[in-house]
Amino acid sequence: MAGPEVTVVIPVYNDLYSLEIAIPRSIEILSRITDRFELIIAEDGSTDGCAELVRQYEQRDTRIHLLHSDERLGRGKALNRAIYESGGNIICYYDVDLATDMQHLPELIGAIHEGADIATGSRLMPGSDSVRTGGREIASRSYNFLVRLFLGSRIYDHQCGFKAFNKEYILPILPSIHSNHWFWDTEILVRTQRHGARICEFPVRWRAGKGTTVKIKDVFEMGSSILRLWWQIHVSKN
């Protein structure tokens, strides 16, 4: 029997409420796109029963897999681990709160089919439909402006948790990604652009989900990470 064509990864950390919705919704949408998919839940040291929920699904559906960690690795490191474990030629991931409208999933996967190395949703491109508080909107636009200014990126929105990769392209890049947490999304887009990646960014409909685990300290850490990555690229040549 042929292996999966598409791997979807959902990173989770104490997100039981959102995961209870995300798993059946993911199966529903993916089943319309391909019958050759797998769903990996990258469970990052949760203590709220996420692992137990996924194990229940595993017993009923062989396409669902739990990738458990006894301790918290960080979102970026959990995604790296899941990508290495994936069986599909196309690897997607999205946030467990399903903030990005899942009707965009065929477009995300289709972009890789059509030759893109990376595809990413955007809340900031013309044509996007994003609803969030004024403070978060200002912070996001400011952050992405700084990434473009300091790191030379051409992407509108680096932090949208709705991305896909050509596995053959992305695997050799992963060892150069140093961020273990939220900056992972930005670093992978910046570094792959410097490698000449074909990136498809497209506008999405996005609504802030419940129970996001991004904290204020994460925002400050991402700001300092911009400067750290600038130093690595331009000074230490790492």
List the predicted regions and their residue ranges.
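Cell-envelope/extracellular polymer assembly enzymes that use nucleotide-activated donors
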Residues: 5-7, 38, 187
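A conserved acidic beta->alpha catalytic loop
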Residues: 43-51, 98
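Catalytic donor-sugar/metal-binding loop of nucleotide-sugar-dependent glycosyltransferases
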Residues: 154, 180, 189-205
